[in-house]
Curated annotation (Swiss-Prot):
GO cellular component, one term: box H/ACA snoRNP complex
SUPFAM superfamilies registered for this protein in UniProt: Nop10-like SnoRNP
Intracellular or extracellular location(s): Nucleus, Nucleolus
Protein name: H/ACA ribonucleoprotein complex subunit 3-like protein
Domain of life assignment: Eukaryota
The keyword Membrane is assigned to this record: no
Family: Belongs to the NOP10 family.
One Pfam family per UniProt: Nop10p
GO BP term (any one): positive regulation of telomerase RNA localization to Cajal body
Any GO molecular function: snoRNA binding
Assembly with partners or alone: Component of the small nucleolar ribonucleoprotein particles containing H/ACA-type snoRNAs (H/ACA snoRNPs).
Protein's job: Required for ribosome biogenesis. Part of a complex which catalyzes pseudouridylation of rRNA. This involves the isomerization of uridine such that the ribose is subsequently attached to C5, instead of the normal N1. Pseudouridine ('psi') residues may serve to stabilize the conformation of rRNAs.
Length: 63
């Protein structure tokens, strides 16, 4: 059995079931595996930089 999660009113609800009470499939509550041999990290960083989605490039909010 794996821990599953579904969203209710913007909050996470954890369960062991594969379906939520509404009949929708639940999602895995575990993060994806980390691989030091990540072949696509360069491409992800390029795309995030292009669309200014990197956390280090967030602009401060104006006062």
């Amino acid at each position: 059995m794996h821990l599953q999660v579904y969203i209710v009113n913007g909050k996470r609800q954890y369960t062991l079931k594969k379906m939520d009470p509404e009949g929708k499939p639940t999602l895995s509550a575990h993060p994806a595996r980390f691989s030091p041999d990540d072949k696509y990290s360069r491409h992800r960083i390029t795309i995030k930089r292009r669309f200014k989605a990197l956390k280090s490039e967030k602009r401060p909010k104006p006062l």
